[in-house]
Amino acid sequence: MELSTHYNPIEVEQKWYSHWMSQGFFKASPHSEKEPYTIVLPPPNITGVLHMGHVLNTTLQDVLIRKARMQGKEACWVPGIDHASIATETKVVAMLQAKGIQKKDLTREAFLAHAWEWKEKYGSIILEQIKQLGASCDWDRLHFTMDAGPSEAVKKVFIQLYEKGYIYQGKRMINWDPVGKTALADDEVNYQPVSSKLYYVRYAIVGSDQHIIIATTRPETILGDTAICIHPHDMRYQHLHGKQAIVPIANRTIPIITDTYVDKDFGTGCLKVTPAHDMNDYDLGQRHGLEVIDILNEDGTLNVTAGHYIGEDRFVVREKIAQQLQAEGYLEKIEPYTSNIGLSERTHAVVEPRLSKQWFVRIQELAKPAFEHVLDNTIQFHPAKFKHMYQAWLNNVRDWCISRQLWWGHQIPAFYLPDGTVIVAEDKAAALAKAHMNPVYKNLTEADIRQDEDVLDTWFSSWLWPISVFDGFGNPENQDIQYFYPTQVLVTAPEIIFFWVARMIMAGYAFTNRLPFKHVYFTGIVRDKLGKKMSKSLGNSPEPIDLIKQYGADGVRVGMLFSSPAGNDLLFDIKLCEQGRNFANKIWNAFRLIKGWEVQAKSSQPDDTMAINWFEARFNQVLTTIEEHFEQFRISDALMSIYKLIWDDFCAWYLEMVKPAYGEPISPTTYAATVEFLAKLLKILHPFMPFITEEVWHQLQPRSAQDCITVAPWPQSITYDNQLLEEAALSFTLITEIRNIRVSAQINPKEPLLLYSNTMLPAWFSRFSNYIQKLGYINQIAVSEGPIQDSVSCHVQGHAFYIPFQQKIDVEQELGRLKKDLEYYQGFLAAVTKKLSNTKFVEQAPPAVVEIERRKQSDAIAKIKVMESRLLEISGE
């Protein structure tokens, strides 16, 4: 069968993914005697479609799980999808509005019917896209956060925490989303600086013709003011202690109070206190027993309590009230000001502090083991720098607001009796049974009980995810949870370190007394090549599916990983996907070259034992490095090591060393070794580029349907000959120098040349002389005691080599070249010497790294010595 000149990923990818699925390669069993290796996919939202962050996260997980599978572990990658309360409800409401249907006109049941219909239609889109990337999940284990199992887990945990006193209901200041019309947790609010205004407003002092000036960024909340506060030691306002003031427009009398909370240097040093609409003002009001006047509706419009501008939006009122203050003589001045505004993570609405009755989790006690076990490295963060962020948050953790004023989600398992008594139970029947335990309620029926209408924060199901996907709450002794939990690694983004990572660790210790995962690998933020965060809304993010169609899934995977150092933001350039595709073509062409060779036992080809031994050593050297990279979660570094091993060492050197002359056969020994090398290279590349490696694996030799690289054994590194590697590297340096001389002298690449040395040839040269002659197109090698006239020199490890020309060389040109090279190596030597003179580097860097730098230094010194000698020689000095 004639092989295509180009690798075609479209023809290959669907074929092999379907084959892997049909063979059950991705299925994991708790009955296995293998070592388990478990990853739980961070469940994407059902509202989502694949974006570049998903591509990065999914690729990294697939690399880890495929490698573990090849290493003989029971690799279990559990996929899932999240119900995403706020995001999904927003989508469903918009869909209904487009049909002329308002949510307020529907019953809860009718709305949820629409939501489930929407979920069935759109909820699996992103999962199908993830499959196109090659994700080797155990799809039989697919979970949805509102499936029966996770839903029961949520109820059990809520009841358990409530009964232990960790969950409570209380009226507190919370973050309110006026667009989503729901409460938000503190970490669901994103803060960003916004250009605004500082309004200086006059408040008249009761019983005098004096006034006090107060600076505020929110004049619309004046209508809810219940006090003015000054610092007790601010001498400017000593005369106002115990006085009263009049609220402009509202004409309400309020007290002037004192509190050290006031910042004397902000504005005028006086603070208007609006307890209903500011977190700090509320705390101040509680200390001083102030009235709380809520002037806003849940949608951010002014309510009847405001007394003015009823039904108008808060930001419209801001402008109108400023104009009224100006017209009535209350506005002293307006200054530009930069405010830090809180925005809803989901709807991007400006968040309103609001006094509201909500459900909360007391988090401080639950956080203690989560804090300790990360700091002592029981759970390891990669990179470790994220421990500091994690520690700072847990040191200042606040109670978690878990109720949301939505319909889509897990309805809170709390039930109200007619007198307002709250009973927490699995369902109405269980709540009624609990009520009947009290004789007062013995005549109640289910019709007398109503369930809390709110749903739980989406993260309340997500924090249980590593346990609930294995039914660890419904059946804590089942084989899945006993075998697959805890998981090995969580791959996630640092922006949800608080939302999800910290809470999962809390849940792990609270409900299983074990860690949920052993490692957390934090990806970076995907940015464009200009450094801007990639976003479809900004128009700077490509469609991953379009990239897959153009470059192949392998090309896109490699492109992402080429640009993604762990924990650091990555600058993505579409050219990296092109580089990934080119790499696939390089592998395909190497395979075609090998398959095109004729194999004959009586081949006249010279013995290639040295080349075979060298590449075997080089493979094991790089494999050792790759394993070190994986241990430290430097996944991109591991890929780059493989890339260089294949592109440079295998294709550029080894294949050229053993390639037979045109029309000549290759020996069976060399051919077999070469095929085996390619097979081993395909194995270590497979986790990164699963499709092309599987295709070439099967093309390389006949195989059964079950004999797939997906389940082939991962190569084991063995000891290797360092001296052989060093000698080969020197030989390759010499060949490269010869090639460079050809280019600079405009000599045909294949024109045979003479090569002289004025010293005895080194041992490394002798061992690789056949390949130096073959790849350098050298037809004669000799030693000359005297100088070689009309020649160009090159230098390797202190040895000078000369290539004579039939025509006289341009002495000035050769002097210029030597001086330029000398200048470069002198600068190089200075840089290396500076690094080695740094005590901190020498003491803290790995010994192997320091040794490499010392070798660079000695090599540079030797080269400089030879070049200086050659300069003297040809200049006649």
UniProtKB/Swiss-Prot annotation:
Enzyme class: ligase
Chief location bin: cytoplasm
GO terms, biological process: valyl-tRNA aminoacylation
Localization annotation: Cytoplasm
CDD domains linked to this entry: Anticodon_Ia_Val (cd07962), ValRS_core (cd00817)
The protein's Enzyme Commission number: 6.1.1.9
SUPFAM superfamilies the UniProt entry points to: Anticodon-binding domain of a subclass of class I aminoacyl-tRNA synthetases, Nucleotidylyl transferase, tRNA-binding arm, ValRS/IleRS/LeuRS editing domain
A cellular-component GO term for this protein: cytosol
Any coiled-coil regions, as ranges: 806-826
Catalytic activity: tRNA(Val) + L-valine + ATP = L-valyl-tRNA(Val) + AMP + diphosphate
Motif ('KMSKS' region): 533-537
UniProt-listed PROSITE patterns: AA_TRNA_LIGASE_I
Keywords on record: Aminoacyl-tRNA synthetase, ATP-binding, Coiled coil, Cytoplasm, Ligase, Nucleotide-binding, Protein biosynthesis
Database matches in Gene3D superfamilies: HUPs, Isoleucyl-tRNA Synthetase, Domain 1, Valyl-tRNA synthetase, C-terminal domain, Valyl/Leucyl/Isoleucyl-tRNA synthetase, editing domain
InterPro entries from the UniProt entry: aa-tRNA-synth_I_CS, aa-tRNA-synth_Ia, Anticodon_Ia_Val, M/V/L/I-tRNA-synth_anticd-bd, Rossmann-like_a/b/a_fold, tRNA-bd_arm, tRNAsynth_Ia_anticodon-bd, Val-tRNA_synth_C_sf
Superkingdom of this protein's organism: Bacteria
Residues binding ATP: K536
Free-text function comment from the UniProt entry: Catalyzes the attachment of valine to tRNA(Val). As ValRS can inadvertently accommodate and process structurally similar amino acids such as threonine, to avoid such errors, it has a 'posttransfer' editing activity that hydrolyzes mischarged Thr-tRNA(Val) in a tRNA-dependent manner.
Description of how the protein assembles with itself and partners: Monomer.
PANTHER family named among the record's database cross-references: VALINE--TRNA LIGASE, VALYL-TRNA SYNTHETASES
Name of this protein: Valine--tRNA ligase
Gene name linked to the record: valS
